[in-house]
Amino acid sequence: MDVQPARTMRNLPDTLSSLMGFNKHLTPSWIESVSHIIDGLSPTKPQMKVMVEKDENISDDNTESEAKVQKIQDELVSLNAQLKQITLQRREALNNYLDLKGNIRVFCRIRPFHHEESYSSRNLFTLDESNVFLKVAETKRKQYKFDKVFDQFSTQGDVFSEVEPVIKSALDGYNVCIFAYGQTGSGKTYTMEGKPTNLGVIPRGIQTLFNQASECNNRFLFTFSMLEIYMGNIRDLLAPRSKTNGIKNVPSLSIKSDPDGGIEIEDLVAVTVNSFQEVKRLYEMGTRLRSTASTMANSTSSRSHCLIRISLTSLNATERRKATSKLWMIDLGGSERLVKTKATGKRLKEGKAINLSLSALGDVIDALQTKKPHVPYRNSKLTQVLRDSLGCESKTLMLVHISPDEGDLCETICTLGFATRVRSIRLESEEPPEMKARKETLLIDLGQKVNDLEHECEDIRRKIKNLEESMEHLTGPQPTIYSNFDMSHLSSEELKTDVSSNVRNSKNRREASSRLPRFMKPTASSQHRIGLNNRTPIINRLKPPVPPRRRPSSVYAESVMVPVNAAPWQSECSSECSMSLTSDMNWTPSIRDGTECSQDASEYEIKQVIFSEHEKSSHDQVTCYTDYPLAESRDIQIKIEEKGIVDIDNWLHQQIVEKTSTFRSKMVLDIPGVTEAEIHVSSIPSPTTMACTKEDSQVKDEVMGLTLQSSTDYVEDIKQSKTDNQFTAKELCTPPFKEFSSNNEVKGHKNEHPVYHGRPRRSLQEELENCTLEKPNMDSKSHRSHDDKHKTGKFTKFFQALQTAWIGALLALGTVSIGLEHGFFQSLTL
């Protein structure tokens, strides 16, 4: 500290004395108070000496601490530069390692036997590290080659050890795709989700992403999206619900290309996430909305492809390949054939759509493997969505699952054939043994180099952390702009004033690039097919004026959070707990429509949301170890506004809880409450639920408990018609008319059931004025036959007589033809 402040304190009495000369015209009390202040500030000579010594000591200490701080800062700058260089080397080594293994790799996993399956089945497979030998006959075997084979005793950790390097490359700026392929019941969902005690690829991969990002010196923005492709339509599983459209009116999201050549899905919800628990919560919400149905292969078969996208954005990171990368984890639909499912109707169409998209995926991967000039991305919505994540420098993994059961042999052969096609194995492409040995040696060296560089990065990060703690001890805690990448802590008011012009320019560029020529615009038929004619494009949609108050929350509907019996990552969760989050009161569910569709709405708005504070654990949040300038924060804010990224809490809180209930995973609308007055007005006894009592000869409704006043004649007529079985319930009576004397009488007898006066009719042919309620004196049968006789015409009588004569002639001819003549019948009478 400089000695200037101490000198100023010593000169303060003289300064105040000089000021008194300019203020003599003021009151004497002010002059007296200033004099007391001067006396208090005037130190004695010993006190002055002590103060000077203290000032000199403080100045020396501050000079020494400033030197230490400067030294620590220089070391931090050097270590950060060294860490950036080593991180770049690690990225290049890992990329070379994966390129040497192959950008498109295919693994095979054989699930173990179920308890209900026969263990006495003959062994179909003979395995080694990279080959599957299938025994198709007693003396015939067929070989299938893979990059890695996992037997029936392999664990989830064994599978993830091969997947982990690919997931790490997503942090380096590369797009990654991980597929799970196989027939229904072969273990796809178990490999991807796992169980709470044995997590699968999806939860392990997400945990790895957050752990690696927390150890990195860069800040990352993670966004989570979840969608399904059902019968060629793209459906957002995280879109806010709307009760204006039913399940059958859900439109398909459209696919667009951005100026950088990437693929963007229009109106797809992207939610910012900061921890594994937030991703887990969103994943559980999305899996309950998947389209599932019962087939011969599985009672809860998925009827669509489920795609999970995690986008990673890190600006000003020179060691990354791209600023934004994508990690796709896809649970494909079952690849079983029609012979296996025996599906008809809608299930048949769903199976066709799944197999067509799987075939298109095989064509694309085969074209990429063989480096064909044309790659057929446009043959399927699945390949269109993944276009920027399959080719170029992207990393792709295909996990093929097969069943050991002998009953699934045909499906196993088809699955292995698809895997062989994806790997593009050719006889002439087999490498010589010397080349294979050299490749294996190089892989081992690169793997060891990657591990060494990772350990070196960890040591440097540890040193940086210790130096930062030392600096904090010397200078105290320094306020930073951001301590994590949670976008909810952004100072939006400051950023709006600084970057409004940049955001406006970026929006204008995006709108200009989204305009299509006339010949490229969709036709009316295509818009009707994908459901675009029911909504207005976002670029042409006018924003409503901002109301003074918040918009009523009845615009959107949210799900009822039903308790899930199964564990969150258990494979059965996606089928048993699947339900529709909202209900449309105008939609009537059909019996034939057995598929549980994932969406009830098409129109929704981009919203900003976040998790509750108690769910944000500090150890799960990714923190940065260096202070970043405000320019990077502005760039991230611009990136968020350009892509329409939303936060998770506001998005969840702005939805409305709609009352829905489920019955066997089917959507059932809640029965609206009915008042007692409405019951009196609208209750009509059903003709099929009437019961007669012998004591009072009254007709009662079994369901409503309503009494019908009817005469004894009519009650006996009902009993007689039951014995004769000639009249139906529809012919006997019609819904009675309600006769009230006045509305006041109804209000006065609310606690009593109203009395209904029945007006019966005997048949539909009788006229109303000829009906009588008097008890007939003759037998009912003769009475009805007499009426029928009067109603019979001459033509009817003639036709009956002719029919009788014709039958008699036929009988006579028949007896003569078999030798039974007049003598035979005469002998019978003797």
Curated annotation (Swiss-Prot):
It comes from the Eukaryota. Residues 56-97, 434-476 form a coiled coil. Residues 103-425 form the Kinesin motor domain. GO terms for cellular component: cytoplasm; kinesin complex; microtubule. Keywords: ATP-binding, Coiled coil, Microtubule, Motor protein, Nucleotide-binding. One of its GO terms (molecular function) is ATP hydrolysis activity. The keyword Nucleus does not apply. SMART domains: KISc. Belongs to the TRAFAC class myosin-kinesin ATPase superfamily. Kinesin family. KIN-14 subfamily. This is Kinesin-like protein KIN-14B. It comes from Oryza sativa subsp. japonica (Rice).
